[in-house]
C-alpha cells in the first residue's frame, strides 16, 4: 500500500468534503420514496368504518338495468383495446360493462411508480352487438368489474386468468383450467334467518406491471353495512394459479357470523348422491367435497350434498393448516360433459399464514334444482371477533389447482370416491334383495396402503350419530386401486333428520392409515 503525504489543511478540507458528500448521500437514502401500499387502503377502510354506511346508487339507464342475460352477453369487450395493450407487459386488463344486476360502477385505478390515476370508462372499448340504446345516456357510466389477461396457455395468446365481478367475488384459473368455483373477500351472517350481508369491493387499485414481472398486485376497498376492509392480492399465474391475500377488516357493528376466506361453489349430484332424474352425466358439480387440514395434523374429507333442506355443518379447529373445496376425480368419464368440462374446473385450497387461533370451518349446503345456482359455501369463522372499529388482520395463500394429490398427507391415504345406493343382501340363491338400508361404499388409496399385502391387518374406526343403526361394516382389499374398500350399510331411524358418520382406516396398533371420512346423509333421502 502506498501512502501519500498531505498537509493538515488539505486533510481537513478533504474530510469536510467527504462528510458533506456522505450526509448528502444519507439524506438521499433516508428521503421517503412514494409507494402505494395496503396501509393506504386500510386508512380509507378505517375512515369508512367510522361513518354511517352509504349504499351505492345505480347510474344505469333502464335499457341496461332491465336487460335479460342473453342481451347482457351481447356486450363484448374488444380485447384488442385491452388496457396496457401497447405496453411490454404480459398482463393486460379488460373490463365488464354495467348491466342487469351489475348496476353500480366500481372505481378502478392504475398505480405506477409515481402516481395513482383513475381508469376511466370508455364506451368505444365495447361491441354492443344488436343492442339499441341512447349513447348519451352511457357517457358517464363506469365499469362493473375487470378481467386479468395473461398468456397462460400459449405465448402468443392472451387468456383470461382472473375476474373480479359482483359483490366481493373473484375467480382465478391456472393453465388448462376453466372457471368453476369462486372466492370472496368476506362473508357475513351466511345461512342465518336474519339474511346474509354481501360486502362489495367498491374500489380497486392495480399496479402497472413491468415487462419482466411474473405477478400482478391488486388492492381493493371493501364496504358493507356492518364492515369495511382493505385487501392486497398478489396473483401469480402458472400451472397452478397462486394468489397471496392480505386483509385488514374493520367492523362498523357486531355481526353474528364472520366468514373469512370464503369459497362459493356448486354441487348438483354425484356418486355419493346420484341424480333422481336419469342423466347421461354421472356427476355434475364444481367441487366434490370439503377438505380440512387441522392444526393437530388431522386430515378430513367431507363429500358434498345437494340437500332438500338448508344444511350447516361446523368443524371445530384450532390454527387450521388448510381447508378448501376440491374437485377430486379428474377422469372425464366421471362427468361426460363436453360443453362445461367439469373435469377441468379447479380446486381452491386456503393455506392460512400465521396462527388463526380457535374457530370453525363452516360448510353451508343449500338446495338447488339446477347447476345455475351456487349452493355451496365454506369459510373460516373465528371464535373471537374484533372490537368495533379495531382492525382484524389476516393473510392466506389461495391455490387454484387440478393437482389434488399435492394436497394430501404424502405418507397417508385418502378417499378416492364415495358411492351411495340402496342397501341389499345376497340370498342363498345369489339374488340380491333390498333390505331397507342405505349402502355407502368408500374407496381409500394412497402411499400408506399401496405397499401393504392384501391380507394386511387393516381395520376401520367407524362412528355414527344416534339416528342410524350400522348393519354392515366390512373392509376388503381393492386390487384395482391397491387400496381398501369400506362398505357401510345403515338403517336410518328418523328419515326426517340427517345422519352424521365418520370412518378411518387404522393398523393393528390403531394407528391411522388414512384421512378421516366425514359424511352426512341428508334428511328425507
From Swiss-Prot:
GO terms for molecular function: carbohydrate binding; catalytic activity. The keyword Signal applies. It is found in: Periplasm. Its main location: periplasm. Residues 1-35 form the signal peptide. GO terms for biological process: beta-glucan biosynthetic process. It comes from the Bacteria. Pathway: Glycan metabolism; osmoregulated periplasmic glucan (OPG) biosynthesis. Keywords: Periplasm, Signal. GO terms for cellular component: outer membrane-bounded periplasmic space. Belongs to the OpgD/OpgG family. Involved in the biosynthesis of osmoregulated periplasmic glucans (OPGs). This is Glucans biosynthesis protein G. It comes from Pseudomonas paraeruginosa (strain DSM 24068 / PA7) (Pseudomonas aeruginosa (strain PA7)). The gene is opgG.
Amino acid at each position: 500500500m502506498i501512502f501519500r503525504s498531505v498537509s493538515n489543511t488539505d486533510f481537513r478540507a478533504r474530510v469536510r468534503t467527504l462528510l458533506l458528500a456522505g450526509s448528502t448521500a444519507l439524506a438521499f437514502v433516508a428521503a421517503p420514496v412514494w409507494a402505494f401500499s395496503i396501509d393506504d387502503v386500510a386508512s380509507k377502510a378505517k375512515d369508512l368504518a367510522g361513518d354511517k354506511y352509504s349504499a351505492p346508487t345505480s347510474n344505469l339507464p333502464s335499457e341496461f338495468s332491465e336487460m335479460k342475460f342473453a342481451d347482457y352477453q351481447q356486450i363484448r369487450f374488444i380485447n384488442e383495446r385491452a388496457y396496457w395493450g401497447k405496453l411490454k407487459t404480459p398482463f393486460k386488463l379488460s373490463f365488464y360493462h354495467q348491466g342487469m344486476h351489475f348496476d353500480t360502477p366500481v372505481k378502478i385505478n392504475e398505480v405506477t411508480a409515481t402516481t395513482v390515476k383513475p381508469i376511466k370508462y370508455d364506451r368505444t372499448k365495447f361491441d354492443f352487438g344488436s343492442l339499441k340504446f341512447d349513447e348519451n345516456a352511457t357517457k358517464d357510466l363506469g365499469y362493473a368489474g375487470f378481467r386479468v389477461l395473461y398468456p397462460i396457455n400459449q405465448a402468443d395468446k392472451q387468456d383470461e386468468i382472473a375476474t373480479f365481478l359482483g359483490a366481493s367475488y373473484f375467480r382465478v384459473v391456472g393453465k388448462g383450467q376453466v372457471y368453476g368455483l369462486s372466492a370472496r373477500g368476506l362473508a357475513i351472517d351466511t345461512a342465518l334467518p336474519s339474511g346474509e350481508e354481501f360486502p362489495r369491493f367498491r374500489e380497486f387499485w392495480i399496479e402497472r406491471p413491468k415487462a419482466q414481472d411474473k405477478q400482478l398486485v391488486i388492492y381493493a376497498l371493501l364496504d358493507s353495512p356492518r364492515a369495511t376492509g382493505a385487501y392486497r392480492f398478489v396473483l401469480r399465474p402458472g400451472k397452478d394459479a397462486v394468489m397471496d391475500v392480505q386483509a385488514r377488516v374493520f367492523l362498523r357493528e357486531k355481526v353474528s357470523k364472520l366468514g373469512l376466506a370464503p369459497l362459493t361453489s356448486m354441487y348438483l349430484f354425484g356418486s355419493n348422491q346420484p341424480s333422481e332424474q336419469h342423466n347421461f352425466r354421472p356427476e355434475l358439480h364444481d367441487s366434490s367435497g370439503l377438505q380440512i387440514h387441522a392444526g393437530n395434523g388431522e386430515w378430513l374429507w367431507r363429500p358434498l350434498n345437494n340437500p332438500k333442506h338448508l344444511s350447516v355443518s361446523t368443524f371445530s379447529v384450532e390454527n387450521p393448516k388448510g381447508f378448501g373445496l376440491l374437485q377430486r376425480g379428474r377422469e372425464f368419464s366421471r362427468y361426460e360433459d363436453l360443453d362445461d368440462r367439469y373435469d377441468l374446473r379447479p380446486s381452491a385450497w386456503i393455506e392460512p399464514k400465521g396462527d388463526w387461533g380457535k374457530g370453525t370451518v363452516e360448510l353451508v349446503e343449500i338446495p338447488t334444482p339446477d347447476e345455475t345456482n351456487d349452493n355451496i359455501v365454506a369459510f373460516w369463522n373465528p371464535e373471537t371477533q374484533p372490537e368495533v372499529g379495531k382492525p382484524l388482520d389476516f393473510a392466506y395463500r389461495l391455490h387454484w389447482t387440478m393437482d389434488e394429490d399435492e394436497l394430501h398427507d404424502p405418507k397417508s391415504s385418502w378417499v378416492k370416491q364415495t358411492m351411495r345406493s340402496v342397501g341389499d343382501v345376497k340370498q342363498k340363491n345369489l339374488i340380491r334383495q333390498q333390505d331397507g338400508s342405505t349402502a355407502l361404499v368408500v374407496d381409500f388409496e394412497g402411499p400408506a396402503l399401496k405397499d401393504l399385502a392384501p391380507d394386511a391387518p387393516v381395520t376401520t374406526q367407524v362412528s355414527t350419530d344416534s339416528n342410524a343403526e350400522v348393519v354392515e361394516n366390512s373392509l376388503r382389499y381393492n386390487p384395482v386401486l391397491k387400496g381398501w374398500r369400506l362398505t357401510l350399510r345403515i338403517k336410518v331411524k328418523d328419515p326426517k333428520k340427517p345422519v352424521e358418520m365418520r370412518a378411518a382406516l387404522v393398523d393393528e396398533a390403531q394407528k391411522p392409515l388414512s384421512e378421516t371420512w366425514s359424511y352426512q346423509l341428508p334428511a328425507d333421502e
